[in-house]
Amino acid sequence: MTMAYENFQNLGSEEKNQEAGKAPPQSFLCNILSWTHLLLFSLGLSLLLLVVISVIGSQNSQLRRDLETLRTTLDNTTSNTKAELQALASRGDSLQTGINSLKVEVDDHGQELQAGRGLSQKVASLESTVEKKEQTLRTDLSEITDRVQQLGKDLKTLTCQLASLKNNGSAVACCPLHWMEHEGSCYWFSQSGKPWPEADKYCQLENSNLVVVNSLAEQNFLQTHMGSVVTWIGLTDQNGPWRWVDGTDYEKGFTHWAPKQPDNWYGHGLGGGEDCAHFTSDGRWNDDVCQRPYRWVCEMKLAKDS
């Protein structure tokens, strides 16, 4: 009897323990959803990191290729410069040797002249030859000097561009190849003609703008390098009053219009007025139809030293 009572108590205790061990179904479902959200967030974060790493790797790879290309160009330019200098130096030595030889002949024939007047014409001919050789040598030396100076500028430009590329091109510190530096700006002079809008677009694609003339000194510099060729500048009134393409204040700035210009003339027969400015053959400004194919000048500002 006592054992049966104890078994009954044990059975009741086990049922209570089992009921106490059951977790509420709703709490278990919330746990599953929380873990699912956490897993999805982890997967999304992993995918985002993978994309960022791929983009950075692609940019680094492109930068390394650009650096290698520029380094190869620099090496080739340096090698070609050395070869040209050696060839020019050899040519100069040869010319100098020829001149020295001719001078010796002149001296020899000068002594013969003392013994016979019939040699005077030959001496005069030799002196003329020496003079021509010397003139040729001076011309060659001048060409050598100009070439060396240009090669030095090209080498400086390549070195500067390499440094700029290493700094991710954050600022323009030097002019690109075939651009001309003057007073903190780089200038590129076209050799063909385009309508004003196309010329403006071309300069924008080169990270520059159609030239903005800010002073008489800049006007004279541009005119010196353009000569008498009609050339577009970055000044237009297509959308209202006259304005410079870089936002420079036209009303307070420098101008150099020809007499009675701008006149917005309609008698050209091309439709509309004249909304774009250009240099005339004497350097003064004129407004004209924007679709005429004139040459143009691009301008790029250099970064100031910090």
UniProtKB/Swiss-Prot annotation:
InterPro entries: C-type_lectin-like, C-type_lectin-like/link_sf, C-type_lectin/snaclec_domain, C-type_lectin_CS, CD209-like_CTLD, CTDL_fold
Glycan-modified residues: 76, 168
Gene3D superfamilies xrefs: 1.20.5.1700, Mannose-Binding Protein A, subunit A
GO CC terms, sorted: external side of plasma membrane
Location (main, coarse): membrane
Domain C-type lectin: 174-300
SUPFAM superfamilies with a match to the protein in the record: C-type lectin-like
CDD domains: CLECT_DC-SIGN_like
Places the protein is found: Membrane
GO molecular function: D-mannose binding; fucose binding; pattern recognition receptor activity
Extracellular topology ranges: 59-306
Alphabetically ordered keywords of this record: Calcium, Disulfide bond, Glycoprotein, Lectin, Membrane, Signal-anchor, Transmembrane, Transmembrane helix
Topology versus the membrane: Single-pass type II membrane protein
Positions of disulphide bridges: 175-186, 203-298, 276-290
Transmembrane segments: 38-58
Gene Ontology biological process terms from the UniProt entry: connective tissue replacement involved in inflammatory response wound healing; immune response
Pfam families according to UniProt: Lectin_C, Lectin_N
Domain of life: Eukaryota
Cytoplasmic side: 1-37
Subunit-structure text: Homooligomer.
Summary of the function given for this chain in its UniProt record: Recognizes terminal galactose and N-acetylgalactosamine units.
Annotated protein name in UniProt: C-type lectin domain family 10 member A
